[in-house]
Amino acid sequence: MKVAIIGATGYGGIELIRLLEQHPYFSIASLHSFSQVGECITNVYPHFQNVLVHTLQEIDVEEIEKEAEIVFLATPAGVSAELTPKLLAVGLKVIDLSGDFRMKDPFIYEKWYKRVAAKEGVLREAVYGLSEWKRYEIQKANLIANPGCFATAALLAVLPLVRSGIIEEDSIIIDAKSGVSGAGKTPTTMTHFPELYDNLRIYKVNEHQHVPEIEQMLTEWNRETKPITFSTHLIPISRGIMVTLYAKVKREMEIEQLQQLYEKAYEQSAFVRIRMQGEFPSPKEVRGSNYCDMGIAYDERTGRVTVVSVIDNMMKGAAGQAIQNANIVAGLEETTGLQHMPLYL
């Protein structure tokens, strides 16, 4: 199956290229850029030398439709909203890595993203692509809104608790930490090496755009769920996310019950690995892979459950999950082309 990538020179784009070039079923038909049209991809990223020969093309929907069946949009917020209706109109399937189609309510999108939302008709058509929890909807989708990186790690951690109804609906606290690649390719003062090295920064306190995305999904599974407390931090690593989730249970529990809850929830999910009781993962242990690793603890004194969830933000948090969703759309095994062992060193 032929695929195209729009926004091929960003970090999400080049991770898609790396994965798709090794995929046994998908092949890259074309790469597209806004600012580097006519450049050979190897001139922009020399690590693709002797692997790719693609020249970056302008975005011509009619030409893309002739060559590809699936389009990956690795574009900034706002761009996908303009492009996607045109791609859908010619029969292409779209997997969007931006946040433009994650929110069903355009007013909520505009409040958190500070930009005009996509047209409501297209928003209604979009399926939220959290692979492990939306498989059946994804199978039939023409437009998949790939989840955000923080949202992916957080939702995989909290949804078993929310679905089971065992936690207080107003008690969810999520503390999240990300490597610098999560901020994208464009440099800022905050991501500048001297500013971040040997340092730690909290950002977007109470206003991160993944908050409504997480809350929307939680209320799908339990309408009584209240607003969450969510904080994000930038840490001096290239890639990786660690989410630490806290929630208060409604009644006293045993850690064995919680362990079984998670093992049962993800027993059919090849990319979610639940650690043994008392063990907790670190981002390094999933780096370069599509895995989400989790560890669970329960504090009898406070009645709180703690879940630690780690992913590679460029893989399970972006390109890896996008290809996992493309596999589902194509009727392939979810693991096809994604069976990479983590790169520990």
Swiss-Prot record:
It catalyses: N-acetyl-L-glutamate 5-semialdehyde + phosphate + NADP(+) = N-acetyl-L-glutamyl 5-phosphate + NADPH + H(+). CDD domains: AGPR_1_C (cd23934), AGPR_1_N (cd17895). Gene3D superfamilies: Dihydrodipicolinate Reductase, domain 2, NAD(P)-binding Rossmann-like Domain. Its main location: cytoplasm. Its EC number is 1.2.1.38. One of its GO terms (biological process) is L-arginine biosynthetic process. It holds the Pfam family Semialdhyde_dhC_1. Belongs to the NAGSA dehydrogenase family. Type 1 subfamily. This is N-acetyl-gamma-glutamyl-phosphate reductase.
